[in-house]
Amino acid sequence: PASEKVVKHVDRCLSCLSCMTTCPSGVNYMHLVDHARTHIENTYTRPFFDRKVRDLLAAVMPYPRRFRALMWLAAIGKLFAPVLPQRLRAMLALAPSTPMSRPLDAGRIVWPAAGTRKKRVLLMPGCVQQVLAARINDATVRLLTRLGHEVVVADGSGCCGALTHHLGKEDLAHQAVRNNVRAWTGEIDGADGIDAIVVNASGCGTTVKDYGFMLRGDADLADAAAKI
């Protein structure tokens, strides 16, 4: 089982991956930390409050509508912050006080290119990002369509899986990955094909690039994940 000392150090890792860019031996610390997080989740018993917070994050943050609702509740909760425990006050302080953006509608979305279509790209709208910073996706769509790119959000795509992956909840993360691989493969193999996948959140991009490794043992989707 993981010790408290190990858990403390792994929990403090931000997965910035600076260690990988500076390591002269090329050690893949990303996969080592990912393995450690899963091992901790499966073998270490966290305090009750910590377990419930992590379960709440896994159940809410990957789903934009749930996350938006939680942010509204947090904004209301700030009114009662003075009488709440310190840890809850600290968490509420992180929540935005301004109105949150409404997530994109579910299902397939297509923004046609302005003029002659030159390229066709998939857009990963993200989960947390499209609630807290939807203008980034809006600007991306405007720019790409103006440059002659058709932009598509695939039906069935969603969270990249990074949130649950970093919580050590491997099964939930891999399910999110499978959902995206299936959704994107349908567009990639379609009549019009796909020229690129556009990801605005760097953490999501890092995870998507690792889909081949994450699903390396999946008999049905390993090849499709590696292609992505």
Residue ranges and their predicted role:
Residues P1:
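N-terminal cofactor/phosphate-binding cores enriched in small/glycine residues
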Residues V7, R12-H39, T207:
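Iron-sulfur cluster-binding cysteine motifs and their immediate structural context
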Residues Y29-I228:
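Iron-sulfur cluster-binding electron-transfer modules in prokaryotic oxidoreductases
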